[in-house]
């Protein structure tokens, strides 16, 4: 089988409050606002692209109005996981930006360090520092 997928270009979420979401992703996680796209039909704001690094983006869509609380029983989306170089520095940055950690840095069952925070839209975010001994580092 030919591997046709070369990477994850972006993930997208619809947000309740764009300003608060931008503050979380830029101040707490350090993403950079890359560019905006307006609706072609109306010229109204539609999508804000945040640069994670190296061609990886998070799309934030304006206009969420219905809560979808995270729940293990739901089928489909569960959480985002973002890789970090230093789990403790990343956790401090999140807290310094005003967001409480749901789970402080700890060693996970996979051998990687992890910490958890919830974004302003109720989306669970896992921060992960990959250990050289973990299955993630050894794969491929």
Task: Report residues per predicted region.
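Conserved catalytic-core motifs of GNAT/GCN5-like acyltransferases
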Residues: 32-40, 105-108, 112, 132-135
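Active-site beta-strand termini and strand-to-loop segments that position acidic
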Residues: 50-54, 117-120, 130
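Short, charged/polar surface micro-motifs in flexible loops or helix N-caps
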Residues: 53-57, 65-67, 85-89
